[in-house]
Regions:
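Catalytic His-Asp segment of secreted/periplasmic serine-dependent ester chemistry enzymes
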Residues: 124-202
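Active-site segments of SGNH/GDSL-like serine hydrolases
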Residues: 83-89, 104-135
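Alpha-helical scaffolding within the catalytic cores
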Residues: 33, 39, 62-72, 95-104
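Structural recognition of the beta-strand scaffold that forms the well-ordered cores
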Residues: 6-8, 51-55, 78-83, 115-119, ...
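Short, solvent-exposed loop/turn segments at secondary-structure boundaries
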Residues: 19-24, 91-95, 126-131
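Solvent-exposed loop/turn segments at secondary-structure junctions
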Residues: 12-15, 56-61, 86-91, 121-125, ...
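Serine-esterase "nucleophile elbow" of acetyl-processing enzymes
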Residues: 1-54, 69-76
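Short helix-capping segments at alpha-helix termini
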Residues: 42-47, 109, 144-149
Length: 202
């Protein structure tokens, strides 16, 4: 059986907070990796996909990119899912957040590693809505430039009519996801990851 190694790196949305933590564990269904792996078992049953969850609650885009660089120096990955930016928005400009994320994207591209760049999930605070929109627009624009870089619209999948986090996907604080929220983005990722692996002939 073929194998592939997928690095999932980011903040609490990658970790699975509040009901799951990659170190302390908890409810595995409160992580997008659970639902993504379940979906890939149907589309690619002949591949054993190993997911490395490097989500750290509270981490910023700069911290995520620093950890990404370290991770890629020691391990070879077939695919990276790099998600971040939520924790920056209260203290960092949208331009700087995007610059930090693009640094991480470029790190993957230079190593010729397939990359999925999700949008920042919705935040249920009006002041944050335009910030999320601005950064996400930049992420989508970046991904459109390259064949081996893929956009995953987490925000579009999770938001309501106000561009807030939809109630059924909300764990209760307007930022973190419920099990249904993690299921939503995990299922969303299945065809995107499937496409990325196809380009690598996996």
């Amino acid at each position: 059986m073929a194998t592939c190694k997928i690095l999932c790196i980011g903040d609490s949305h990658t970790a699975g907070f509040p009901a799951f933590d990659p170190m302390m564990l908890g409810n595995p269904e409160s992580s997008y990796q659970f639902w993504l792996k379940k979906g890939l078992l149907k589309t690619r049953p002949y591949i054993n996909c190993n997911f490395i969850n490097e989500g750290v609650c509270g981490d910023t885009s700069r911290g995520i990119v620093f950890r990404l660089t370290q991770a890629l120096e020691t391990t070879n990955y077939d695919l990276v899912i790099l998600a971040g930016g939520t924790n920056d928005l209260g203290m960092t400009s949208e331009k700087q957040v995007l610059k930090n994320l693009e640094e991480g994207y470029e790190t993957c591209r230079k190593r010729e590693i397939a990359l999925i760049a999700p949008s920042i999930p919705p935040i249920s605070l009006q002041d944050y809505v335009p910030k999320v929109i601005t950064v996400n627009s930049g992420i989508e624009t970046y991904t459109a430039k390259f064949q081996n870089v893929f956009f995953a619209d987490w925000c579009g999948a999770l938001k309501d009519e106000q561009a807030f986090l939809e109630n059924r996907y909300n764990s209760g604080d307007g930022v973190h996801l419920s099990v249904e929220g993690y299921k939503r983005i995990g299922v969303l990722l299945v065809p995107i990851v499937d496409n990325a692996l196809s380009l690598k002939s996996l």
